[in-house]
Regions:
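Mobile gating loops/cap/lid regions near enzyme active sites that modulate substrate access
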Residues: 143-150
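N-terminal beta1-alpha1-beta2 submodule of the flavodoxin-like/Rossmannoid cofactor-binding fold
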Residues: 1-90, 150-182
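Short, glycine-/small-residue-rich phosphate/pyrophosphate-handling segment
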Residues: 92-143
Length: 182
């Protein structure tokens, strides 16, 4: 999902930094889930997000798996580390949006995106959800962001519906950020 959003942002004219947050879960817990372990192994060399990355950006698209209807602890930890930047007002007036994935259709996708946005309210950020601004949103059905159901084994591939929704979200975020920047 993140790679698709990054590519769509670039196609919309943005300079993009694709980052991940540091993995904080113990290795034995990760090893107990084959899909998670594989993901960690394939992304281990990707750059971890820093405060400088969010300061650099005019717009931020956060992606997180859903954990019990909430933001994953790794992303929450990154957001919590931005207290100094928040206190200095450096996170305000940026565009923010989110995307998520769950194993089940009612696995907390909307509550996760809403919880993610709680920090953005405190930042003074500008949340740019997709809403129902394009007919394709009636197919994916999530006005708060984009969500994907991975299935019980976390292996369900993204569909054209989700690819289109991710493209729309990224394009919308880039467009609105550009309008705000002038």
């Amino acid at each position: 999902m993140a790679e698709r959003v990054a590519a769509a942002g670039e196609r919309a004219g943005a300079e993009v930094r694709l980052r991940q947050v540091a993995e904080t879960v113990p290795r034995d817990v990760i090893a107990s889930n084959a899909a998670w372990s594989n993901h960690v192994d394939t992304t281990r060399n990707g750059p971890d997000a820093t405060a400088d990355d969010i300061l650099w950006a005019d717009a931020v698209l956060f992606g997180t798996p859903t954990r019990f209807g909430n933001v994953a602890s790794q992303l929450k930890g990154y957001i919590d580390s931005l207290g100094g930047q928040w206190a200095a007002g450096q996170l305000a007036d940026k565009v923010y949006a989110g995307f998520t994935a769950t194993q089940t259709a009612h696995g907390g996708q909307e509550s996760t995106l809403l919880a993610l946005y709680n920090a953005v309210y405190h930042f003074g950020g500008i949340i740019v959800p997709p809403g129902y601004t394009d007919p394709l949103k009636f197919a994916d059905g999530n006005p708060y962001g984009v969500s994907h159901v991975t299935g019980p084994s976390n292996s369900a591939p993204l569909t054209d519906v989700e690819f289109n929704a991710l493209d729309h979200l990224a394009t919308r975020v880039v467009t609105i950020a550009g309008r705000l920047k002038g």
